[in-house]
Amino acid sequence: MERTIKPQDLKLAGKYLIDVRRAVDRDASAEKIPGATWHNPEQLTDWADTLPKDKEIILYCVRGGSVSNGVVDALQAKGLNARFIEGGIEGWKAAGGEVTAK
């Protein structure tokens, strides 16, 4: 199963988009990717089983590093179709992706 998706290849329609930035990083930012729901990565066990099993799940953190990697590992281990955006929200913006106020 693929682990990542390039920002320029991502089409948001039909995807379940999750912001997994750490709380401190999310609080320091005024923006998010449209349609994203924030889930605290430190509470993964509390919300992982609530995710839809019939949709592709796309995650992002700040730069597509350790946070996204760890969450994708955990979700894929549960059989979910999860990937993360290469470069995180910063890569998304650099590729011309839209952001909105959170």
Regions flagged by a language model, labelled:
Residues 1-16, 20-58, 63-102:
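Rhodanese-like catalytic fold shared by cysteine-dependent sulfurtransferases
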